[in-house]
Amino acid sequence: MGTPGTSAGALFLSSASAPSRKRAAGEAGEAGVARSRQRVLDEEEYIEGLQTVIQRDFFPDVEKLQAQKEYLEAEENGDLERMRQIAIKFGSALGKISREPPPPYVTPATFETPEVHPGSAVLGNKPRPQGRDLDDGEAGEEEEKEPLPSLDVFLSQYTSEDNASFQEIMEVAKEKSHARHAWLYQAEEEFEKRQKDNLELPSAEHQAIESSQAGVETWKYKAKNSLMYYPEGVPDEEQLFKKPRQIVHKNTRFLRDPFSQALSRSQLQQAAALNAQHKQGKVGPDGKELIPQESPRVGGFGFVATPSPAPGVNESPLMTWGEVENTPLRVEGSESPYVDRTPGPTFKILEPGRRERLGLKMANEAAAKNRAKKQEALRRVTENLASLTPKGLSPAMSPALQRLVSRTASKYTDRALRASYTPSPARSSHLKTPAGGPQTPTSTPAPGSATRTPLTQDPASITDNLLQLPARRKASDFF
């Protein structure tokens, strides 16, 4: 069975030949390995090793689930040879009979979870040969002797090619930044060197300071000080005096079965006896005694109540777990055979009555008639407006109707606009009456004579002098 970790085991076996003092240091010493001492692996090898460690520590049942899946597939395909290989490979771990009573619950897994007892090694943490035949027994024993490192130790010891190349790029960028801003770090380096020289104990001949400053340098010089730059933060020195953190994976499971049947049965019986003694002689809210007296016993057995037949046992239920062959129907509240047990009034929208339905029908019909009348009136007005022109007069119209249409057509046409687009004779600035009517005298009337107010203005006078715009005044005109 090819599972992740086949080549990862060879990786850890090759690194297992390190001196024993490295293994004795433990995770605390390995976590602080410098980045330069990390071993660079291929991307596929690094991911496979990381996947193996994570699967072993956090998902130990994945291997058994994969074996179970392959066993079921082989059984479905009738591959007896594959079934035999899986049974031989996992038979030693699955064939052990536990002497402790089984748990009160049954898990759906076919392969049992290995039980962990105090003083015994964790079975899930032991690496097994994956994807190998039984002939490689020696290699499997050698692999079982060398435990795989934890996740933190693996990340501190190994890195991928992408991570290593990224670190190199960051180092090169940092060196370029220092070279570009050498003036920023030169004074800081000189100060650190001078301070280091002052801390060293010179010989007796050089203890006399010949050229010294007026005061003692107590202020530490820093290029990026906290006044002009954002502070970099205080180093967390508190973690240096604490024990290194470690993930204890065995704490996620019980060392022994906490739900023992014998212990649980005795505790339940004791709790039931105490509860019955506490409720002895008390009356519930329904007026009945909480623990009624026992019925007479015959041969150690008490009487049981006569079973009452439940109606509709053999009938088809309202809902089944089968497939729905058509659109499901909504069950109304009145059609449901179950009685509503919720006390108090319930909200329900009643169906409209016959009178209300008749009123709505009449209102809809009246509204439809009104809309039809309105549409017909609008259509007639549109047709009339389109035909109210002297050129559009029908010869079938009577003379009186033609004069009426000619007289009313002037209300819907703009004579001034028509005159601006058509040539006209010499215009006069005097006021005139509409065509066909009596003309207004051009001379000034006598004081006592009656005058007539012009009804309309000359249509040609509306568009006269439109382009004769007044000249814009200059600044010199105001002085």
From Swiss-Prot:
Pfam families documented for this protein: Es2
| UniProt subcellular location | Nucleus
Chief subcellular location? nucleus
Q: Which cysteines are joined by disulfide bonds?
A: none
Compositionally biased region (Acidic residues): 135-145
Q: Which GO terms describe its biological process?
A: mRNA splicing, via spliceosome; nervous system development
Q: Where is the composition biased (Polar residues)?
A: 455-466
Q: Which family does it belong to?
A: Belongs to the ESS2 family.
Q: How does it assemble?
A: Identified in the spliceosome C complex. Interacts with FRA10AC1.
Q: Which PANTHER family match?
A: ES-2 PROTEIN - RELATED, SPLICING FACTOR ESS-2 HOMOLOG
Q: What is this protein called?
A: Splicing factor ESS-2 homolog
- Give the gene that encodes this protein: Ess2
